[in-house]
Structures are given as structure tokens and as C-alpha cells.
Amino acid sequence: MSFRGGGRGGFASGANRGGNFGGRGGRGGFQAQTGPPAQVLEMGTFMHACEGEMVCESVNPKIPYFNAPIYLENKTPIGKVDEVLGPINQVYFTIKPQEGIVATSFKPGDKVYIGGDKLLPLEKFLPKPKPPPGSKPKKAVGGRGGFARGGARGGRGAPRGGRGGAPRGRGGPRGGGFGGGSFGGGGFRGGSRGGGRGGPRGGSGGFRR
């Protein structure tokens, strides 16, 4: 559906090209095409060229995968999605043209298309609703210790051990959508929850016989 550092300048609107789309993998090269999909859907319209790439405005309610192949209406491949930019309610994306395709050969308003299997629903990048007040998260319970055998009969063993494990850590706040370009205002930075939870609860101490 990584994080790139410095921005690449040159957008007509002055947007930063460092569009950090939460959880994005590294920029992959062009892979061998297995052929166009049986059906292509309109993804967006060409706006202008920038540094050899095509800047497009999305007209699709869904979000394209990074590196998703992009086609003309006749299913001729022209390149792959390189960046997703803009606020969550107005998405832009860039296309890295494949060999033989020149970004400046397109005119503003030219339509580009994508396979339906290369789209993600917008809801996937929105924060999940908070649980209702008063609800408590389920806690994992550690197993009890066993009984040790052997040795002469004596008094009771050591008192029960304390609970193990560090206190539960909380992750960072959930993100919203996409970072990067400042087209029409700031977007939301995507991403999954931050740091994981703490270690599981330790078992109780055993009794010696």
C-alpha cells in the first residue's frame, strides 16, 4: 500500500516530494509485467510533469498501491505509482514512467487507469473509533508454577513470587492518511500503532514439598 527523507523540489504548487505514506516499503524497480488486468478503472487525470515524472490528481475513491502499474484506457502500460500526496480528502499521486514513455508527452486532463486489484479502501488509513467509556481491555494471565519434588520433608517453600513482566507500554497515536505534498493543506500521516505492548504477566511462584 521506506520513509523517504528529504523532499524533491520542483512542484508547481511548492509541495514537498517526500510524501511519507505510513508503512511504505522501499521503492521497488520495475518488475516483469504479467499482462494488463481484464478490466481497468479510472485512477486520475494528468496535471503536469515534474522531474521526469507525471503528477496526477486522483478521481478514484480508493487509494492506489505503491508501485501499482498504471495504464491508458486501452490497457497500454505507462508506468507505476511512485508517490501518494495531499490531504486525505483530495489525493494526488505521481507516476514514474516506464522506458519509452515521456511525462511531457501527456496533456493536462489526460486520464490514467489502474487495475481494481491494486486499490485499497480509504477506511484502511483512517483512525479506528475509540472503545466505549468504561470498557476494559482483556488481560492475558500467565500460567501457575509447578510443584517441586525431592528432598526431605520440610516447612513450606518460599512465598509466592511477584508478578513478572514490565508495565505495559503504549504506542504512539494512530495516524490518519497521507503525508507529503501540501496540495490544498496538510494531510494526515499514515501508519500503524507505535510500540508494542509490554511483556506477558509472569507465573506465580511454586510450592516446595
Swiss-Prot record:
The keyword Oxidoreductase does not apply. One of its GO terms (cellular component) is box H/ACA snoRNP complex. SUPFAM superfamilies: Translation proteins (SSF50447). Signal peptide: none annotated. Residues 1-36, 125-209 are annotated as: Disordered. Pfam families: Gar1. The keyword tRNA processing does not apply. GO terms for biological process: snoRNA guided rRNA pseudouridine synthesis. Residues 1-29, 142-209 have a biased composition (Gly residues). Residues 144-203 are annotated as: RGG-box 2. InterPro entries: Gar1/Naf1_Cbf5-bd_sf (IPR038664), H/ACA_rnp_Gar1/Naf1 (IPR007504), Transl_B-barrel_sf (IPR009000). It is found in: Nucleus, Nucleolus. GO terms for molecular function: box H/ACA snoRNA binding. Keywords: Nucleus, Repeat, Ribonucleoprotein, Ribosome biogenesis, RNA-binding, rRNA processing. Its main location: nucleus. Residues 4-29 are annotated as: RGG-box 1. Component of the small nucleolar ribonucleoprotein particles containing H/ACA-type snoRNAs (H/ACA snoRNPs). PANTHER family: H_ACA RIBONUCLEOPROTEIN COMPLEX SUBUNIT 1 (PTHR23237:SF6), NUCLEOLAR PROTEIN FAMILY A MEMBER 1 SNORNP PROTEIN GAR1 (PTHR23237). Belongs to the GAR1 family. Non-catalytic component of the H/ACA small nucleolar ribonucleoprotein (H/ACA snoRNP), which catalyzes pseudouridylation of rRNA and is required for ribosome biogenesis. This involves the isomerization of uridine such that the ribose is subsequently attached to C5, instead of the normal N1. Pseudouridine ('psi') residues may serve to stabilize the conformation of rRNAs. The H/ACA snoRNP complex also mediates pseudouridylation of other types of RNAs. The H/ACA snoRNP complex mediates pseudouridylation at position 93 in U2 snRNA. This is H/ACA ribonucleoprotein complex subunit gar1. It comes from Neosartorya fischeri (strain ATCC 1020 / DSM 3700 / CBS 544.65 / FGSC A1164 / JCM 1740 / NRRL 181 / WB 181) (Aspergillus fischerianus). The lineage of its organism: Eukaryota, Fungi, Dikarya, Ascomycota, Pezizomycotina. The gene is gar1.
